[in-house]
Amino acid sequence: MVREDRSTWKANYFTKLVELFEEYPKCLLVGVDNVGSKQMQEIRQAMRGHAEILMGKNTMIRKALRGHLGKNPSLEKLLPHIVENVGFVFTKEDLGEIRSKLLENRKGAPAKAGAIAPCDVKLPPQNTGMGPEKTSFFQALQIPTKIARGTIEILNDVHLIKEGDKVGASESALLNMLGVTPFSYGLVVRQVYDDGTLYTPEVLDMTTEELRKRFLSGVRNVASVSLAVNYPTLASVAHSLANGLQNMLGVAAVTDVSFKEAETIKAFIADPSKFAAAAPAAAAAPAAAAPAAKKEEPKEESDDDMGFGLFD
């Protein structure tokens, strides 16, 4: 098989990337740091039928995206995020499910000296099973220990490595001796591209109820601003109508203007005693029901006593 020259390969790559953006409405921009070729092959197999994965050099990705901005200007949002080792996962399925599949294919890895820790590494109190000759490793890391039954025992919780720190040779050696593989590597979602909109992966964690609360909060904010500047919007129109009705009722109360909603207020102003008499009558109705209930009690007692007298 004749291998295509570099210029042809680049042209084919540009074409493929553009076609994928046209075919798929959404994709995940993923980081691929510390992902080996074998693991990448396993990820591709797991995503087969669900998503299309495309990697490439950053310079080629940027060039391909810039060349397609005329047809799809929204791709410009991706350009600032094409840094370090990245790739694309194109899909037509639910983005949250695709991310879950990527997380399922993360692999555990040892802490190599010189690597940047992707997470905190802590050691709980434990018996290490190591002999006293290994005490120097713990002393170098200032880990409090004691010898119990001929083995080294860690006394307290130890925060061995902090996220973002470089792994030292002593930390790496100790974790290897303990058989601990604290890190895991895989495709990490950095940005989500969905029909021209770019957002962070945290949005995928939001539930329907959280979205509803945020939407209602936004509607309330829009209504408040609209009312403050006297600019009617769909969110504020109900409040504007209610405020307008209150103003009209206030005008009707002190003028001869009358309409159906104002009749009760006008009647109250004309003769408040009618409403004062109605209030005790309404309160008396529940009170009148109480004696009626009490009158029924003797009847119930007589029924219970029938046939069970003291002299039967």
UniProtKB/Swiss-Prot annotation:
One of its GO terms (cellular component) is cytosolic large ribosomal subunit. GO terms for biological process: cytoplasmic translation; ribosome biogenesis. GO terms for molecular function: large ribosomal subunit rRNA binding; structural constituent of ribosome. CDD domains: Ribosomal_P0_L10e (cd05795). Phosphorylated. Residues 287-312 are annotated as: Disordered. Gene3D superfamilies: 3.30.70.1730, 3.90.105.20. Keywords: Phosphoprotein, Ribonucleoprotein, Ribosomal protein. SUPFAM superfamilies: Ribosomal protein L10-like. Coiled coil: none annotated. Ribosomal protein P0 is the functional equivalent of E.coli protein L10. Belongs to the universal ribosomal protein uL10 family. P0 forms a pentameric complex by interaction with dimers of P1 and P2. This is Large ribosomal subunit protein uL10. It comes from Caenorhabditis elegans.
